[in-house]
Amino acid sequence: MQPLSTELILIRVTGEDRPGLTASVTEILAKYDATILDIGQADIHNTLSLGILCKTEEQHSGFIMKELLFKASSLGVTIRFYPISVKEYEDWVNMQGKNRYILTLLGRKLSARQISAVTRILAEQGMNIDAIKRLTGRIPLDECDSRTRACIEFSVRGTPKDRIAMQELSLIHISEPTR
């Protein structure tokens, strides 16, 4: 008997978030005994972005995608599928050994200019951003409150081309006067 062929599929779900959405998607994967290799989810202002990388038997992949398409339609979300080659997956797994850093940006408020400066410096240094997370509460539109604080965490990976220069540049280019 010949071993079953497997497929790697990256599933991306976007749309209005609601309770039970992730459960609905993963229940279909469970029905076909798929293995979840990676999963990530973000919700910004009730807008969901869910990514699932799964491994399944080739004979089940069509059924999985069909059921997920119907489920996405009934939930009013968009779903996309991307085949991942074994080589792409292995290359991704081999990136695990790269250095990881957490960069935290603090301020009374954080502007697009400051975030742009941080991300530009990271890119120039050859660093890749794995995740960005707001750590503080939601910022009110009325910015009169002097107690308002903003904090964003960047999870980055790689080896900086020049770590000392990166630290010096960061402090100079990111600071903005408080208004």
Regions found by a protein language model. Give the residues of each.
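The feature marks the first
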Residues: 2-46
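Short, surface-exposed ligand-recognition loops at beta-strand->loop->(often short) alpha-helix junctions
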Residues: 12-21, 57-59, 106-114, 159-160
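Short amphipathic alpha-helices in soluble, non-transmembrane regions
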Residues: 25-29, 63-72, 118-122, 166-171
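A short linear hydrophobic-aromatic micro-motif
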Residues: 35-40, 80, 128-134
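Short, charge-patterned binding micro-sites
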Residues: 38-57, 85-88
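Short, low-order "capping/linker" segments at domain edges
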Residues: 89-110, 143-151
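Surface-exposed interaction/gating patches
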Residues: 97-132
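Residue-level detector of conserved catalytic or cofactor/ligand-binding positions
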Residues: 172-178
